[in-house]
Amino acid sequence: MVLTKAAISENLFEKLQLTKKESKEFVEFFFEEVRKSLEKGEAVKLSGFGNFQIKKKKARPGRNPRTGEIFLITARRVVTFKAGQKLKNKINNYLIKKNNNF
């Protein structure tokens, strides 16, 4: 199972009694704010969930595994996510409970 923006929007519609349009706009606005911050190189810290950050990767040599051709992988920025301790604990507690039910 995969959680999608549409599913998040539907949950907001059902649980917070927003209109479908409002719930969709809320989800879009949230992700747009996260994207804008990351584009500027700012970290996004969501208390109780985790942190998104931009890491700079230096240019480095790479190799095509099929042809063996050496080429330069250009410098770039990548998004990383580090789960917060509360999220890690909830996931681990869920897995422990799930495994004990077998």
UniProtKB/Swiss-Prot annotation:
GO biological process: DNA recombination; positive regulation of metabolic process; regulation of DNA-templated transcription; regulation of translation
Molecular function via GO: DNA binding; structural constituent of chromatin
Family annotation (SUPFAM superfamilies): IHF-like DNA-binding proteins
InterPro entries named in the record: Hist_DNA-bd, Histone-like_DNA-bd_CS, IHF-like_DNA-bd_dom_sf, IHF_alpha
Highest rank taxon of the organism: Bacteria
Keyword Transmembrane (UniProt): no
GO CC entries: cytosol
Pfam families: Bac_DNA_binding
Keywords from the UniProt entry: DNA recombination, DNA-binding, Transcription, Transcription regulation, Translation regulation
Stated family: Belongs to the bacterial histone-like protein family.
Assembly notes: Heterodimer of an alpha and a beta chain.
PANTHER family: DNA-BINDING PROTEIN HU (PTHR33175), INTEGRATION HOST FACTOR SUBUNIT ALPHA (PTHR33175:SF2)
Function: This protein is one of the two subunits of integration host factor, a specific DNA-binding protein that functions in genetic recombination as well as in transcriptional and translational control.
Protein name, per record: Integration host factor subunit alpha
Organism in which the protein naturally occurs: Buchnera aphidicola subsp. Acyrthosiphon pisum (strain APS) (Acyrthosiphon pisum symbiotic bacterium)
Classification lineage: Bacteria, Pseudomonadati, Pseudomonadota, Gammaproteobacteria, Enterobacterales
Gene: ihfA
